[in-house]
Amino acid sequence: ATNAFVPDYLRSTGQSEWIGAALSGLNVGQLPASFLLLAFADHLERKTWPYIVCGLLCVIATVGIVFGAGVWVLAATTLQGFAASAILILVLALPPLLSRPDDVHRVTAAMFTISYSCAVIVPVISGLAWDLTGVAKTAFLPIALCGILLVILAPAINHIPRTGS
C-alpha cells in the first residue's frame, strides 16, 4: 500500500523531488531484509520477537514517511521496504512451523487467502481514509495499524514443536 500512496502524498506535501528516491528506497530496503533473514534463519525460527520488531519498524517507518521531509522520507521508505519484506518472508515461513506436516498445504492456502485479501483491502481503506478526510496523512493510518496489529498478535503464534530432531 505504501508504494501506491507515496507519490501522491509527496506531491501533496510539496516534496515531488523525492518521489523517485522514495520509491527506490522501498525496493532497495527489501534486499538487506532478505539476506539478513537468510543468514540468521536458524536464530529467528520459532521466535516471536522478529515479528514484534518488524511490526514496530513498520510503525516507525510509517510515522517517518508521514512526518518526515527530504532525506528522512527516503530513510523511512527504505525502512518500510525492509520491514515489509521481512514481514512477508517471516509470514511465508509460518505454515510449516504452525501446522502438522499433513496440514501445511491447508494452512498455506489460508494464509495466502488472508494475506492477499489484506493486500487488496488495506489500500482501499487507505484511499478511503484520504478521500473522506481530505487529509493525505490519513492514507498511512491503516498501514501503521497493520504494524500495530502484528505487534499485538505476534505473541499468539503457537509454533508446533519439532519432532525427531
Where are these regions (language model features)?
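Extracytoplasmic gate region of multi-pass secondary transporters
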Residues: 1-34
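Hydrophobic/aromatic end-of-helix segments at the C-terminal termini of transmembrane alpha-helices
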Residues: 2-10, 91, 95, 125
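Helix-to-coil boundary motifs at intracellular loop junctions of multi-pass secondary transporters
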Residues: 9-13, 43-44, 94-101, 132
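Helix-to-loop junctions at the C-terminal end of transmembrane segments
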Residues: 33-46, 130
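C-terminal transmembrane helical hairpin of 12-TM major facilitator-type secondary transporters
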Residues: 45-94
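A late C-terminal transmembrane helix in Major Facilitator Superfamily
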Residues: 98-135, 143
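Multi-pass alpha-helical transporter architecture, strongest
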Residues: 141-165
